[in-house]
């Protein structure tokens, strides 16, 4: 975690500070997203928006509703696996959209994410990302891709970076 660059943060494509917040119980990481529930929330949001726009009489109210719809959709689309939220944001999202995602806190949550990680899928996503990214993003993506490929070549699973059993040598 504390190495420079942090391999855990590099694989997650998150800043080291955010990953440290999760490990030290100050932040939450999204472990999984329920796409069906997410789509249902978006559908209900659209239908509610249409009903409220019909009942709104003045243009100012309709514009405010459109802005609110855009902001809410942006919040929902922001919920993706490995996304890290601070405590306040997590609690707000859990109250609003709790059915569409599962989040965790601590190194155990990160371990679970790494345990369920498929390196070939991540490699494919990074290759697609490299085709359409800028110079600054390209450098980070290439570092991430080289790490993923090194793990695959060496036959290393990502969850092996976590100590689950601490070896103790008894005295004398």
Language-model regions, residue ranges each:
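Conserved core architecture of multi-subunit DNA-directed RNA polymerases
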Residues: 1-172
């Amino acid at each position: 975690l504390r190495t420079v660059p942090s391999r855990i943060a590099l694989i997650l494509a998150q800043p080291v500070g955010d990953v440290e917040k999760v490990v030290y119980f100050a932040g939450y990481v999204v472990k999984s997203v329920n796409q069906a529930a997410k789509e249902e929330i978006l559908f209900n949001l659209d239908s509610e928006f249409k009903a409220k726009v019909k009942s709104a009489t003045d243009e100012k109210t309709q514009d405010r509703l459109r802005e609110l719809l855009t902001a809410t959709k942006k919040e929902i689309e922001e919920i993706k696996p490995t996304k890290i939220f601070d405590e306040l944001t997590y609690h707000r999202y859990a109250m609003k959209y709790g059915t569409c995602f599962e989040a965790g806190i601590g190194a155990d949550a990160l371990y679970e994410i790494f345990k369920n990680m498929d390196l070939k899928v991540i490699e494919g996503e990074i290759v697609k990302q490299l085709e359409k990214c800028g110079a600054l993003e390209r450098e980070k993506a290439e570092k991430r891709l080289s790490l993923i490929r090194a793990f695959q070549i060496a036959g290393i699973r990502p969850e092996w970076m976590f100590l689950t059993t601490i070896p103790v040598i008894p005295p004398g």
